[in-house]
Regions:
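Extracytoplasmic small-molecule ligand-binding "clamshell" domains
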Residues: 13-78
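An extracytoplasmic/periplasmic, membrane-proximal ligand-sensing/linker region
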Residues: 14-17, 25-36, 220-221, 225-285
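A bilobed periplasmic-binding-protein/Venus flytrap-type ligand-binding module shared by bacterial periplasmic
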Residues: 23, 103-115, 215-229
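Ligand-binding cleft/hinge of the Venus flytrap
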Residues: 36-46, 139-165, 195-201, 276-284
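Short helix-initiation/N-cap motifs at beta->coil->alpha
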Residues: 51-62, 75-77, 155-174, 215
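A ligand-binding cleft/hinge motif common to bilobed small-molecule-binding domains
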Residues: 73-86, 149-150, 175-178, 182-202
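Short beta-strand->loop
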Residues: 89-98, 158-162, 195-213
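A conserved helix-loop-strand patch within extracytoplasmic ligand-binding domains
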Residues: 95-151, 157
């Protein structure tokens, strides 16, 4: 009887580490990147790891808050929002390029805009059809709007009295290159990767200004992972990210897709300026 009872007892399923990211680029690239990363983390951490895509930036923050995602690649602003909504979270890592990240302003060939030699020339955007990326994007909206404001350009000064919101950096580039918008802002790493991939026609679109640097993307882990997966598990995730080695094929592919040479440690205070700007522009309350 005892053996029968034991046989009937349900087998407890091994917990799955659910990873996610803000959808800042096209879904095909994201599925490839995070699919490979899930395999790498699963191999290093010895637990099942699954990539769970989300529809928009706000959904990434919400899924993290509710526990639908355990580990998320956030932008600067969304990471701050997530940490404020989910006490006890931990910032783990950023890319080598994230400590001094930049956005670029781009313009279509038909816009008449030429490369700016100083930030004051951002005033030339007044009256232009202009698009940001996602409303919650750090590099595609928050910091570009901040620098515009510092140089006397309000969003109400743009054509139609407001900007467009393309939803992603790739979409911003496509819309400006097609002429649907005369100008826009996106993160420089995405611009560079598209140029490298041959997806930019420099006769139709060009960079007109680059922002000063600021801190941006970072990995954030939910609280309670050590309780679910074992003591020290959050530290193990951090080490798995920091140990990605460009000399190993799978790690090299991951780093290439991230546009980085390595991941480095990060901490919440790196994003204090982003929080201050977010509050100033009403994106954090």
């Amino acid at each position: 009887m005892a053996s029968a009872a034991l046989a009937a007892a349900p087998v407890q399923a091994q917990p799955v580490l659910k990873i996610g990211a803000i959808p800042d680029q096209n879904p095909e690239k994201l599925n490839r990147l995070y699919g490979v990363l899930a395999e790498e983390l699963g191999s290093k951490l010895k637990v099942p790891v699954r990539y769970v895509p989300v529809s928009n930036y706000a959904a990434a923050v919400s899924a993290f808050r509710t526990g639908s995602l355990d580990l998320v690649w956030f932008g600067g602003l969304t990471g701050v929002q997530a940490r404020l909504q989910t006490p006890g979270t931990r910032v783990l890592a950023q890319r080598d390029i994230d400590a001094k990240f930049t956005s670029v302003f781009i313009a279509s060939g038909a816009s008449g805009l030429k490369p700016f030699t100083d930030a004051g020339q951002l005033r030339q955007l007044k009256g232009k059809r202009f698009t940001f990326g996602s409303e919650s994007s750090t590099s595609g909206r928050l910091m570009p709007q901040y620098f515009m404001g510092r140089n006397g350009v309000k969003t109400t000064d743009l054509a139609g009295g407001r900007p467009g919101f393309s939803g992603s950096h790739d979409a911003t580039l496509a819309l400006v290159q097609s002429g649907a918008y005369e100008a826009g802002a996106l993160n420089e790493q995405v611009w560079r990767s598209n140029v490298k991939a041959g997806k930019v026609n420099t006769d139709k679109v060009k960079v007109i200004w680059r922002t000063p640097p600021y801190a941006d993307y970072h990995w954030v882990a939910r609280p309670g992972l050590d309780q679910r997966f074992g003591k020290g598990f959050t530290n193990r995730i951090q080490q798995a990210l920091l140990s990605l080695n460009p000399k190993q094929p799978r790690s090299a592919l991951i780093l290439e897709l991230f546009g980085a040479k390595t991941f480095i440690p990060a901490k919440a205070s790196n994003y204090d300026r982003i929080e201050a700007v977010g509050r100033q522009l009403g994106k954090i309350r």
